[in-house]
UniProtKB/Swiss-Prot annotation:
Top-level taxonomy: Bacteria, Pseudomonadati, Pseudomonadota, Alphaproteobacteria, Acetobacterales
Cofactor binding note of this UniProt entry: Binds 1 NAD(+) per subunit.
Residues the record lists as binding NAD(+): 165-167, 199, 228-233, 251, 286, 307-309, 352
Annotated SMART domains: AdoHcyase, AdoHcyase_NAD
Family: Belongs to the adenosylhomocysteinase family.
InterPro entries: Adenosylhomocyst_ase-like_sf (IPR042172), Adenosylhomocysteinase-like (IPR000043), Ado_hCys_hydrolase_NAD-bd (IPR015878), NAD(P)-bd_dom_sf (IPR036291), S-Ado-L-homoCys_hydrolase_CS (IPR020082)
Cofactor field: NAD(+)
Keywords: Cytoplasm, Hydrolase, NAD, One-carbon metabolism
Subcellular localization, as worded in the UniProt entry: Cytoplasm
E.C. numbers: 3.13.2.1
Top-level taxon in the UniProt lineage: Bacteria
GO MF entries: adenosylhomocysteinase activity
Name of this chain's protein: Adenosylhomocysteinase
């Protein structure tokens, strides 16, 4: 594979596609700030006290415009940061340039090879003058696993890590269960203001955007198949239904399957759906959800894509045995021996970030406000507060704070409990309003 390594002076502590895109990136960063009230409120609240002073954060998360606002919030609160992307296709090159031009070390560009992907992550582990991280901010767990496998001695200085997504949290749980987690972790994904907003409402807007940008296909009237009906699957199914698709859902969990049926979706197996669908989206976080046999059964020019974190949900490697014809960046046709073609988006990686620009700024503000609060929580923790090394969640009052910071932007006004009402249901007038096990 021809290298996509950009030409950047070795003396500079960054590597991006084109630093000349920085002005464009800065303009979009400023626009995004207005749509990210949670992060901007944290800058206002904590900008003077600098609660992250002394924190050296290694970050591995999609290098988008929205992430640029997150990064600059972390630095505004006192942290130093080194950054890479957690996906080979998700970087927005003008966003990376904007951050690099601001003097923040970033190593990311769209279209990384696997070798370049890991090289970029490695650059966040060490920096000039002996810089090493004492905090980790991750999305998907690749940086976390690298640190545990290759640099376990560095983890002695790491106070904790925060993890953004479902897949990464599963990896953390497995490490903790095996007694191999070497630093405390906060599961940001399961904050209500992340999973019930980013995963659901974010996908509801960004999935169809990615498919349309990739294919220009008419969605209305198509039969769409969504594998998985968790929060991401729910948002994906709604996205496709809102575009006029007839949506089929596949599920392994009887509760999620019943939810899908009660929403009016037809619940089927992938074996049944393969020959019926015009468009397939995986959202399970699992492996081999769409197999080569499923793809052999699909219609000519069926569209196949994934909105889960990794590219393991579709058996892409099995398709490598056939001829690939690139149509444009992140859009390929795979030609079967009988002449049938399938349209594969982003090589089975995140379609909304590979073929489009991901979730809107507003919903990412909620997710990233959780990330900043998690970093503060871990960095400011009292000795032993987050021991043993385990996977924790943010306390309910912080989850509610994140939501409250976003209400004014959408014109929402809260009702306040009277003393009698608060006493009747046994809560404080200031919250938290629900117990930790409440299912929103």
């Amino acid at each position: 594979m021809e290298s996509s390594m950009p030409d950047t002076a070795v003396a500079e502590d960054y590597k991006v596609r084109d630093i000349g895109l920085a002005d464009w990136g800065r303009k979009e960063i400023r626009m995004a700030e207005d749509e990210m009230p949670g992060l901007m409120a944290l800058r206002e609240e904590y900008g003077n006290s600098k609660p992250l002073a002394g924190a050296r954060i290694a970050g591995c998360l999609h290098m988008t415009i929205q992430t640029a606002v997150l990064i600059e919030t972390l630095t505004a609160l006192g942290a130093t940061v080194r950054w890479s992307s957690c996906n080979i296709f998700s970087t927005q090159d003008h966003a990376a340039a904007g951050i690099a031009a601001a003097g923040i070390p970033v190593f990311a560009w769209k279209g990384l090879s696997e070798e370049e992907f890991w090289w970029c992550i490695e650059q966040t582990v060490r920096g000039p003058d002996g810089w090493t991280p004492n905090m980790i901010l991750d999305d998907g767990g690749d940086l976390t696993v690298l640190m545990h496998d290759k640099y376990p001695e560095m983890l002695k200085d790491v106070r904790g890590l925060s993890e953004e997504t479902t897949t990464g949290v599963h990896r953390l749980w497995e490490m903790a269960k095996a007694g191999k987690l070497l630093t405390p972790a906060i599961n940001v994904n399961d904050s209500v203001t992340k999973s019930k907003f980013d995963n659901l409402y974010g996908c509801r807007e960004s999935l169809v955007d990615g498919i349309r940008r990739g294919t220009d296909v008419m969605m209305a009237g198509k039969i769409a198949v969504v594998a998985g009906f968790g929060d991401v699957g729910k948002g994906s199914a709604a996205s496709l239904r809102n575009a006029g698709c007839r949506v089929l859902v596949t599920e392994i969990d009887p509760i999620c399957a019943l939810q899908a049926a009660m929403e009016g979706y037809e619940v089927v197996t992938m074996d049944e759906a393969a020959s019926r669908g015009d468009l397939f989206v995986t959202a399970t976080g699992n492996v081999d959800v769409i197999t080569i046999d499923h793809m052999r059964a699909m219609k000519n020019r069926a569209i196949v894509c994934n909105i889960g974190h990794f590219d393991s949900e579709i058996q892409i490697e099995s398709l490598r045995n056939y001829r690939w014809e690139n149509v444009k960046p992140q859009v390929d046709e795979v030609v079967f021996p009988d002449g049938k073609r399938l349209i594969i988006l982003s090589e089975g990686r995140l379609v909304n970030l590979g073929n489009a620009t991901g979730h809107p700024s507003f919903v990412m503000s909620a997710s990233f406000t959780n990330q900043v609060l998690a970093q503060i929580e871990l960095w400011q923790a009292k000795p032993g507060q987050y021991l043993p090394n385990h996977v924790y969640t943010l306390p309910k009052h912080l989850d509610e704070k994140v939501a409250a910071l976003h209400l004014a932007k959408v014109g929402a006004k809260l009702t306040k409990l009277s003393d009698k009402q608060a006493e009747y249901i046994g809560v404080s007038q200031a919250g938290p309003f629900k117990h930790d096990l409440y299912r929103y």
